[in-house]
Amino acid sequence: SLFSLKFKGLNEMGIPTFLAADGSITSTNIQFQETVNMSNLVYEGPVDPTITGSLGNIFKWKGFTLNVFMTYSFGNVVRLDPIFSNGYSDLTAMPREFANRYLNPGDERRTNVPVIASTRQNNDISNLYVAYSAYNYSDVRVAKGDFIRMKEISLSYDFPQSVTSKLRMSGLSLKFQATNPFLIYSDNKLQGQD
């Protein structure tokens, strides 16, 4: 089972806020090791899929054979990869979500992606790193784990006997194959994350 902290939005400075165990709204008064009062946690669902399977088919026409194999999984949830860390450098690749982050006052009404905290904010707000760690493990960072994936697709051609006999071969075929070429369906929140 997956549990998350309840995200309550961004404050006027773009800092994430959460439901604390005592029922208050907070950015930094979050106890990650709480074992008694867990009323501030949200049950997201199972982490293991409840339905899994595959579907395959072979299509033949003249000398061509098309083989498709798909896998599917449904009924679970996944936590999105963390997007905030304690620091960034010029070499750090920024997540896509940062393009939609809080930049100016009022942005808290259009986005749920927090501001990248400045050095001043980190110095002025005690334990601000807690808010960003909590954001990474909040309910807004959870997606459905359902997917349908094209696992394998291949196209082969069996050359006719008239060609193979001239080459003194009993058979000749040419095959093109791709493994894991694309997802047919997954939650949009995943943005390519497996």
Residue ranges of model-derived segments:
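Extracytoplasmic loops and strand-loop junctions of Gram-negative outer membrane beta-barrel proteins
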Residues: 34-43, 95, 133-141, 194
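Membrane-embedded beta-strand positions of outer-membrane beta-barrel proteins
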Residues: 68, 174-176
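Repeated loop/turn-to-beta-strand initiation elements of outer-membrane beta-barrel proteins
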Residues: 63-67, 162-163
